[in-house]
Amino acid sequence: MYSYIYKALLYHGYEKFDLDIWEYFNK
């Protein structure tokens, strides 16, 4: 879980972070 968040921040930056997390939890 936290590794996904860490990778999302690294690869996409904070602006895309919220969208990625939203999609992740709604799969």
From Swiss-Prot:
Its main location: mitochondrion. GO terms for cellular component: mitochondrion. The keyword Mitochondrion applies. It comes from the Eukaryota. Keywords: Mitochondrion. It is found in: Mitochondrion. This is Uncharacterized 3.5 kDa protein in COX1 5'region.
